Amino acid sequence: RRSLARLERLINAESCLVVDVEGQQIMALRPNLPVVPASTMKVLVASVALEVLGPEFTYKTKVQGIQDGGTISGDLYLVGGGDPVLVSAQYPTIEPLPTFNGTSIESLADALIATGVKSISGSVIGDESRYDSERFTPTLGLGIRMTEVGPLGALMINDGVVTGNPIKPDNPALAAAQEFTNILIAKGVNVSGAASVGVASSDIPVIAEISSRALPDVLAEMLTNSDNNTAELVLKEIGFSSVQQGTRLAGAQAMITK
């Protein structure tokens, strides 16, 4: 306690409360002073996610379409399941804080090709309908948007970046559809149309699907890298799993009640 007390002179007009694992107070300095919690909230998000989603939870990303032999007749739908660590092989090599425990988007392309697909007569359509379309938390400053977090969506590859494009698109689902199109073309699949966005009908067959690593591995990436995108998407998944609403507010409400 004496050692911790010496830290008081290093803390300005802020608030600090230290407790042990049993919830017993060790040190307090203006504990009732409201302050912005910042990234410490990620610990709470991780804790509630493990309770609501469970440690065995995995994110699913799938492709849907009408397959006729080696051809997808019409559009191929790339359907996002909220996976915040869905990345191409190249992306972690260019990140300041490389994504680890990621889900390989190339593995989905390989799974599709393994079914015999050689061409798509339409376009790759990005479907982000699992979550809402709120790209940023309204209170975020302009210095944080696009760089530290967002734009957000249930379908994001490489944090919404298209490899080779220095400008991050406003629509992460469109960026994901473009990235997946590029990957398919590089693997020898002919794609006739330009990438776009839309919603897959429930009666369109699932052709291939991939899963992320188990939730604790995703949360490890979030906490180690202090990954804002991962935290925001995990919060939306908490909302979706709790009340079928993939929104920030639904996720926050679930956290309050847990």
Language model segments and positions:
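Mid-domain, small-residue-enriched loop/turn segments at the edges of structured enzyme/sensor domains
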Residues: 14-15, 71-153, 160, 188-189, ...
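Charged, often glycine-rich, active-site loop that binds/positions anionic groups
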Residues: 29-31, 75-81, 135-142, 202-215
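Active-site SXXK
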Residues: 37-55, 124, 155, 179-184, ...
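Active-site loop and adjoining helix of the penicillin-binding protein/serine DD-peptidase-beta-lactamase fold
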Residues: 50-53, 98-101, 119, 164-172
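A small/polar active-site loop signature that marks catalytic segments
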Residues: 161-258
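Beta-lactamase-like hydrolase cores
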Residues: 1-34, 55-56, 60, 107-117
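Short, well-structured active-site flanking segments
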Residues: 51-66, 188-197
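Extracytoplasmic
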Residues: 12-14, 30-32, 38-41, 56-60, ...
